[in-house]
Amino acid sequence: RAPEAHLLHPDLEEVPKPVSVAGGTAGSTAHLAWLDGGGAPFDDVAIVISELGVADEVNRPLWVHLELPPDAPDLDLLAGRVTDSDGQVLSTFEVAAAPQAGQYGAFYHLTFPLRAGSYSIDIVGAAASEPQVKRSLTAEVSTVPDQGTWLSPVWLGTGVTPTPEARHGTAFTIGGWHLAPVSGPELTRTAEIVYFGFVVRPALAEEGTVELLSRVHVKRDGMSLGRPFEVPLDTAHISGDLHMYGNSIGLSGIPEIGPYDFVFEVIDTNSGASAERSVSIEITE
């Protein structure tokens, strides 16, 4: 194989980096320079959530949720880079931003299909060629366990949008349903919380069916409010040994406004495998 120097176009001075995100292009020098400049107006108020998602029975891409307050302009560009644990830049990206309505303001999702390992990710969002927000985060990427029944994290949202054309593994998208994640504690009594997730290699019943059960515990001041809400969950087959579920709970039945803790538990009844997510919510009128 020829050395890298012999593969370069005469006008290039270095080997181009791979693209970090699907649908994007390599980050331009000008846009990547924003990452090393001064602060941006919404750095201190942006909400950033990063979690490992699920693409198939093996791979867990990094999902990033970036949400800005209502007074922020809609972003038109997201750019950034991915570096490894040694500080070497592995890939860069820039992609047109697609704002969507979130719990507090517009949100943006990015999907990073990374191999198992440790990474740092730097992201900048811009509007009209002006940086509006910058954020750096670290991630430890792993794969799905290769044996036994495994349940993904339970993802909580304020709503979902059908996106049947979405690729498997797209950020916060479960079986063609795109979540607007719960990004803060305030919700009204007219709101609902949706909860979605995946199960890999479920233990099938005699009829060959997947049997999942959800329990939603509601607590106030550390005390449970009655018995948990317990319902069987419908599932849908995605591919191979990968299945998904989704459900929701309305908040109109909560007795009064104030702070509550919700615990969402999902159980594969045939194997006993389970996953759980807790969230603190301040319910308002």
What residue spans do the PLM features occupy?
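Intrinsically disordered, low-complexity terminal regions enriched in Ser/Thr/Pro/Gly
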Residues: 2-285
